[in-house]
Amino acid sequence: MSLNMYLGEVQGQTQSMNAVCNATIQGMEQVIQSIDAFAIDTVLQGQTYSSAKSFFVQTFRPLAQGIIYLCEELIRQNDAFPSQFQSQVASTDVIEQEILEQIREIDRMKASMEAISQAMPIPGMDAMANLFTVMRKKLQEKLDHLYQFNQTSSNNYSTALQLAASIAAGLAEVQSGKGFSPASGTFSTQGLNMEWTTSIQAITEERARQAANSIEEGEMCGKLPEKSTGEKIWDGIVEGTGQAVSDTIDGIKALGDWETWENMGNAALHPIDTLSTMYNTLSDSFINDVINGDAESRAKWGSYALTQVGLGLIGDKGLSKASKLGQAGKVTKLAKNKIPQAVSHITSNLQMGDRFAFAGGNSLRFRFDTPDFKKAEEKLSTYQFARGESNYGGSNFVNENHRSSLSNREIISNLQHTEKFRPNTLKHILEGEINWRGDAMGYHTEVLENTPGKIISGTEEILNDQGIYKARVEVNGTPKTGNRGFSTFFPKDWSPQKIVDNINEAYNNRTYEFGNTYSGIGSEGIRISMYIDGNGKIISAFPAE
């Protein structure tokens, strides 16, 4: 089988594979937001609810987070793959059989020239023979580089394979039937092997440290450097959803599609195969709504993939088709079709039993038909009723113990027009936070209740007749030290959405001041100072003194 690299085709189709990953990232971020909303809901009380919240946060949340990290890693490697080929092998298409034929032709010509030279010496024949020798050497070097690239390129995806292995191990654990106790009616991870979360948690902690450093530096130094593609994706996925837990459960069920992860492992080992087949196997809806659509259609497609299909990775929505690389058949080949040992090892060690079920054709699906999940679905189905929601379009009776209310997280997640803000910026502005060094940061409005940030009594000062004031603040009992301990505050009658809208207006007419500091005039005529990172995202914003 010939080893071929059609560089132009690979570069063009990289966008298709990355689009699938981006849509999956969006869907998984929505799953995480739904789980978080359920976990912090103060209306749902009791032993079963409390244990269920903890169980979902400790199991399904890291699974969704791991999928995000996996997709980000695939995007990084997909973007790097063509450039690595160009630097290591060639800047044009390389077809193994063509190079071999050229080498054989040179060998034939050299043999003919030597025979002629022996029979009848011709001036300049030696120089021509040397030229052919040089040409042959160059072709052989290109071929050797192709072989070497073929052997080493799959190593670039080792991190992705490790993440896929962790995700598969996590899926096996949560389906083991050991997470729910019928006797006590509670959920627990005590009987589960949670080692699979280690690699995912390590990435999460590193991201948190980087984010904390960026916010701290953003208030004290010059412009931050341009971020990588993965970081841009990370900053762009936070969006309010208001998903009910029943939708989250649908998404979680789809996490159990083992075929998806087997295909993902195959995709990682055969990147050229992936890029060569992705475009032709995407469904029409994906091409229309994601590749050729606008931001709204992409968001709608991602939301549909979450609530109606799960992850957007099964059926005709993309990856379960597009990643069947070893089954593609008549496509360009660079590597042999073999399922990686790591993925095969995971497959062989999963206890099948009743946890596997055939779901049409010859595809083997990994299902959440386990006691744990059924109990969770049964117990948590009341979550919609506790929030006054119904699947039938009406309102449900809510008693005094289940009174509907919106948490601060839900209020923030439902804000509109937040595309210009970094993921944690609105929490930073509206609630205040403690950075990784333990310093109190932000807090520029009193509009929300029960926030970490508080005004220190007796320190409030009116700054102007527009309603702007300042005060010394503390966050979770820690006094703020930056800016002499003061924060400036938006008017007390401004809603969170009004604050966002005014910051957006100030952003649109901003002028540069120094470092990464800008200022602009909000829609209500108030001057707003902003810290903006190298990617154009707002780190913090507050009324100017």
From Swiss-Prot:
InterPro entries: Bact_secretion_toxin, EndoU_bac, LXG_dom. It is found in: Secreted. GO terms for molecular function: endonuclease activity; toxin activity. The keyword Nuclease applies. Residues 1-217 form the LXG domain. GO terms for cellular component: extracellular region. PROSITE patterns: LXG. Keywords: Hydrolase, Nuclease, Secreted, Toxin. It holds the Pfam family LXG. Its EC number is 3.1.-.-. Toxic component of an LXG toxin-immunity module. The C-terminus (residues 322-545) has RNase activity in E.coli which is neutralized by cognate immunity protein BC_0921, but not by immunity proteins specific to other toxins with the LXG domain. Degrades 5S rRNA and several tRNAs in vitro; cleavage is endonucleolytic within the anticodon loop for tRNA(GAU-Ile) and tRNA(UUC-Glu) but total for 5S rRNA and at least one other tRNA. RNase activity is suppressed by cognate immunity protein BC_0921. In the N-terminal section; belongs to the LXG family. Probably interacts with cognate immunity protein BC_0921. The interaction inhibits the toxic activity of BC_0921. This is Toxin BC_0920. It comes from Bacillus cereus (strain ATCC 14579 / DSM 31 / CCUG 7414 / JCM 2152 / NBRC 15305 / NCIMB 9373 / NCTC 2599 / NRRL B-3711).
